[in-house]
Amino acid sequence: MQSANDLKQLLFSINHKSYPAYKSTRGAYQFPRYTLSIDHVQGDPFAAPSRVSVHISGKTAAFPSFLYDTYEKRVALQDYLLRQFARTIAPYSFRAKGSGKSGLLGISRCGQEILERTACVLNPSDGSLVVNMEIGFPANGRTIASQELIRILFDFLPGCVEKSLFYRALDQKACANVARLCEDQQAIRAALKEKGLTAFIADGSILPRETGVFDLPMKHAVPFTSPESLRVTLDLPNRGPVSGMGIPLGVTLIVGGGFHGKSTLLQALERGVYNHIAGDGREYVITDASAGKLRSEDSRSIRNVDISLFIHDLPGKSDTTSFSTADASGSTSQAANVIEGIESGTSLFLIDEDTSATNFMVRDELMQRVVADSEEPITPFISRVRDLYEKLGISSILVAGSSGSYFHVADTVIQMKEYVPYDITDRAKTTAAEFPPFTASVRPFSVPAFHRCPQPGKGLTGSDRTKVKVMGQESILINKSLTDLRAVEQLTDSEQLNGLAALLLEAAEHKMDGKKTLVQVVDLLEKQMDEKGLASLLAPGRPSDLARPRRQEIFACLNRCRELRF
């Protein structure tokens, strides 16, 4: 391995040369306390920045093993280190001068959720650390300005590494608090199963966000307070007793007037599948990790999905036991989302009537009289929600503000009033008894068979050079194949879409053969990430900064990719 001085001499030698001479710097260089690896050099100062990684041995980094002795604690520590490093390098970005992206220092930007990312990887076997970042190699026009890169690599970067990536230089109490919070969050997740709960919201939690764009907690928001009848006290290993609202298994209805906090509560539950950083306000809002948000999704593609549990006898005799369309309606898309959610292994559905297809959710008595059940191909969700729980063990939490039909099938009814929850189950049931329940002649409940075996189309594998473009949190473009993920609401970070793009290509190139079922393909992808790490998905032609998506979002991506054949 070459030394840091070798790199400095090389940079001196290529100063004022044409930009491609920077390519000669690729390789690993030993600095006093870490190894610097120049992994990819940009083609010109206006292109995507160069990729650089910092490698620190476990002995030098010296993080105690109790900080990363479980997967969840390791991810939390990586997240903390990444935030510290990002904060440390930020003042130095663009301090070195030049054209285009010259002088840029960049790294993954973490949100409020704690996610596994390739930007910071701690090896659990030896404690070694790798941090991946991007640097804009400086130039004037397209002429190398290596004296500016020397400033970055020899003046700016070493100090940033020393301050933020070595245990002895960090606030050790803060590091321990990261581990303790993670232990408490995992203890709540374990308690959900033990106590028969779908979710837990601690008293004092701050659920509203600053705006629809900024995910920080809203200032002066009303802290959450559990109704006494739903209050559960959990004994956490570090914080001790914590009280809050436990939402039981079964069918839960959230009601209330407009703007009183129904959707805010549901959105907090959606994000409760992830752990949150200290100070977010939702640190102790924990939801069943497999929970899936359901909604209608006009125009999505559906391929060979058995939606006969909800849709049957379509005009034209379309086979709904193997239903396909390139342009789904609101009801067929939501039916497919339910079935695909079952296939993904979810134990909890989250539904807001505002984003649901009305004719999929319920039919009122007058409509039943005008349009007979025999003439209606849709079996509404209200006719299946009890069966989903009683026969498959899948609970549902629904937000409703206009239809009272679900009072008859709900186990628990929570009313939000001025952002405060009230348990009105008894009152709702008593009042509902005065009205006839929704009844309809429906077919017997039967569990769909999941035997779809995907194969990639030429749009994914037919090109010698794969081009991948991720558009925020909305969609993935691979070559000319667009996968629309705008309606997959539990994706929280654009790097999760990078991860999905890499997983989609990995599946298409190495996992799919037309014989393995979709479930088996996703199992193989998760096994690879568990055993080899998220970084095993990194490859030329794929995105470089990945965050791990959940199993449910992997299914959602594969189901929406129009280039897959089932």
Locations of regions flagged by a protein language model:
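Conserved P-loop NTPase nucleotide-binding/switch module
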Residues: 341-385, 389-390, 399-429
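Flexible beta-alpha connector loops of hexameric P-loop NTPases
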Residues: 145, 310, 314-331, 363-378
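Conserved alpha-helical scaffold flanking the Walker A/P-loop in AAA+ ATPase domains
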Residues: 329-330, 334-341
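Carboxylate/His-rich catalytic cores and anion/metal-binding grooves
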Residues: 193-199, 203, 259, 266-297, ...
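N-terminal accessory targeting/assembly segments
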Residues: 1-196, 207, 558, 566
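N-terminal pre-Walker A segment at the start of P-loop NTPase domains
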Residues: 208-243, 278, 286-302, 307-318
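Conserved NTP phosphate-binding and transfer environment spanning the P-loop NTPase/kinase superfamily
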Residues: 390-393, 399-566
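Glycine-rich phosphate-binding P-loop
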Residues: 242-274
